[in-house]
């Protein structure tokens, strides 16, 4: 680069570089072998804010924290805080940090990016769902599960669904409804609670994991619960 500036009879700027970046095992990162690319990270739903926060601090003595703006990263940048030893790019850490991004991000910032069932994206919904999502696509998916055109398989485990339905407490839904419902079921059937919980979650959401069922059934409401169990 210096030779190019000399050949152009241009003033040579003051330059420097950070240490070599490797993968977590110490292997080289190369765009030629596709070991890492912005396009690949985008496909993995890594948020730009999470990525820039991570890249700005790895290899330095500063803690990796979620930034509010690029200007914040610029103001905090200190070349003297970086090590001379090779820096390891930890892909798993980045993915976990991306999950943390959704737990910390401001409600209004996220709401601007919601394009489906936006009327249902409330602060209450966001507090309910944010620890179970790691991408905007997953937020849209949960909005669809709760408020959209969620597909209900009426031909699957009819007897089990009907049994659970008959055990549902005959009272307005609140945060105690779930524990009462589960108690009603366990008193009448010899099955492990973990299996019952797994079945009900699958029947109501089509998922094997997700938010607490005690809150989920409140968001769903009795009408939708009954529809999905009939």
Predicted regions and their residues:
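Catalytic adenosine-cofactor/nucleotide-binding cores of aminoacyl-tRNA synthetases and other
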Residues: 6-152, 205-230
């Amino acid at each position: 680069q210096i030779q190019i500036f000399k050949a152009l009879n241009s003033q040579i700027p003051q330059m420097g570089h950070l240490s070599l970046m490797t993968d977590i095992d110490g292997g080289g990162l190369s765009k030629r072998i596709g070991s890492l690319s912005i396009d690949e990270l985008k496909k993995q739903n890594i948020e730009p804010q999470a990525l820039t926060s991570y890249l700005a601090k790895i290899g330095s003595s500063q803690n990796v924290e979620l930034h509010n703006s690029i200007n914040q990263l610029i103001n905090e940048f200190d070349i003297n805080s970086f090590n001379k030893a090779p820096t390891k790019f930890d892909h798993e850490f980045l993915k976990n940090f991306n999950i943390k991004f959704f737990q910390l991000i401001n409600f209004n910032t996220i709401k601007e990016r919601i394009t489906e069932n936006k009327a249902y994206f409330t602060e209450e919904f966001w507090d309910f769902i944010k620890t179970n999502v790691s991408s905007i696509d997953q937020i849209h998916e949960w909005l669809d599960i709760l408020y959209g055109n969620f597909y209900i398989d009426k031909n699957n485990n009819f007897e089990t669904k009907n049994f659970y339905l008959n055990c549902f407490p005959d009272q307005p839904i609140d945060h105690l409804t779930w524990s009462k419902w589960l108690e009603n079921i366990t008193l009448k059937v010899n099955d492990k609670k973990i299996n019952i919980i797994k079945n009900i979650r699958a029947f109501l959401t089509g998922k094997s994991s997700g938010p607490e069922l005690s809150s989920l059934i409140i968001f769903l409401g009795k009408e939708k619960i009954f529809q999905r169990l009939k």
